[in-house]
Amino acid sequence: MTQYTLKQAGSLLQSKQISAVELASAYLAAIAEKNPALNGYITIDQDKTLAEARAADERIAQGNASALTGVPVAYKDIFCQTGWRSACASKMLDNFVSPYTATVVQNLLDEGMVTLGRTNMDEFAMGSTNENSFYGAAKNPWNPEHVPGGSSGGSAAVVAARLAPAALGSDTGGSIRQPASHCGITGIKPTYGTVSRFGMVAYASSFDQAGPMAQTAEDCAILLNAMAGFDPKDSTSFEREKEDYTRDLDKPLKGVKIGLPKEYFSEGNSTDVQTALQNTIDLLKAQGAEPVEVSLPQTKLSIPAYYVLASAEAGTNLSRYDGVRYGHRAAQFGDLEEMYGKTRAEGFGSEVKRRIMIGTYVLSHGYYDAYYLKAQKLRRLVADDFQTAFARCDLILAPTAPSAAPKIGADTSPVETYLSDIYTIAVNLAGLPALTLPAGFSGGGLPVGVQLVGNYFAEAKILGAAHQIQLNSDWHGKRPE
């Protein structure tokens, strides 16, 4: 019962072939069996889950259900939810039970979706491996010696392991797309401002965007329909007409121009990634799409620009965690200043501290112009590159990561880890939508994904192209043994 896609589960619930309680119970049993080894979930509450499932069954019986009523979903631990611990995988918030619910979570609760639990992540969404979690690293379900990616590693892992039909993630520099690639699932980062950020713990406010993670592009489209929409509580939310993100799913690819950035098809990619890209190009050409070469020359500048800007925003956003109002507080201190220092030293992990220090430095007097202001100018150049490319193509095909998932505990420096985000970060700098879908496997049996990037608000076009690829391939249908 836990092998269904989100769409299949919804159809079976609506036709009353299964009940929401039966489906939730099946997932809870699978979670109890497999999660201790996987560590994909960090908070589970069976009583709350089954109460939501019973309410969904009542709604279905009364005939006022939506297509998602009764379908289970997992939430990355970055989304606040009333009555649930919302820790952001940090010691700083280990005892924080949210008094309110994020808008995007409320949207899904309003549809009648059933909460399975809270998924593991890199602390405050800072990381690419899920090893920065206070609760220990989540494992890759294809090989537990490897990382699931990050920062939405737990969400990717539970969907791949069939411990949830879908999950919510957030993407600041690739945190939906990179773990989706490493775990062999589909995930989309929408255009910045499409999904409300209210109630999503802030890392870098001008980059953060929530998105769906599921087995298929079709599932992501269905879920995004419920997630997206204007929210007056979020000042960065776009006020636009409600879209149907499933509208292009059946649209053929004949004549669609697919941009291939020459800077992304480089020697830096593993053979497995090159093969996955070629597999996808061949599938697109077979369906009538037209590959065209494009150039994104500022790609090499995206890493330094991103880590300056995101760290600056993180340093500001995380200043609120001081031990005064909520969260961790040092047990012993002499005065207020010592309490601040000890609380933050104890409450934050090493990667979070590193980024706060970088952010404080680049915003300090004498360095603002040299680093922060220059990075903002680079951000504009990166965005302009994409607009030049989209003048020649409809969508861009690119790698998601240079290789398959690395091993847990791999001896890599922070800079080496940052460089693994080379293909995802530029999209966040520009605020564009992008989707990762499975496209093959490494020689070691690990999934490899590729990404489709679209222009602003082209989510339906991206999802349609991905769906057409998945209709003609079965990488998304593979699951770990």
UniProtKB/Swiss-Prot annotation:
Key words, A-Z: ATP-binding, Ligase, Nucleotide-binding, Protein biosynthesis
Would the keyword Nucleotidyltransferase be found if you checked this record's keyword annotation?
no
Q: Sorted alphabetically, which PROSITE patterns does this protein's record hold?
A: AMIDASES
Catalysed reaction equations from the record: L-glutamyl-tRNA(Gln) + L-glutamine + ATP + H2O = L-glutaminyl-tRNA(Gln) + L-glutamate + ADP + phosphate + H(+)
Q: Which residues form the active site?
A: 76 (charge relay system), 151 (charge relay system), 175 (acyl-ester intermediate)
InterPro entries named among the record's database cross-references: Amidase, Amidase_CS, Amidase_dom, AS_sf, GatA
The UniProt entry's GO CC annotations, sorted and at most eight, read:
glutamyl-tRNA(Gln) amidotransferase complex
Q: Does the keyword Magnesium apply?
A: no
One of the record's GO molecular function terms: glutaminyl-tRNA synthase (glutamine-hydrolyzing) activity
The protein's superkingdom reads Bacteria
EC number(s) per entry: 6.3.5.7
Which Gene Ontology BP annotations are present? translation
This chain's function reads:
Allows the formation of correctly charged Gln-tRNA(Gln) through the transamidation of misacylated Glu-tRNA(Gln) in organisms which lack glutaminyl-tRNA synthetase. The reaction takes place in the presence of glutamine and ATP through an activated gamma-phospho-Glu-tRNA(Gln).
Q: Which family does it belong to?
A: Belongs to the amidase family. GatA subfamily.
Task: Describe, as the record does, how this protein assembles with itself and its partners.
Answer: Heterotrimer of A, B and C subunits.
Protein name, entry field: Glutamyl-tRNA(Gln) amidotransferase subunit A
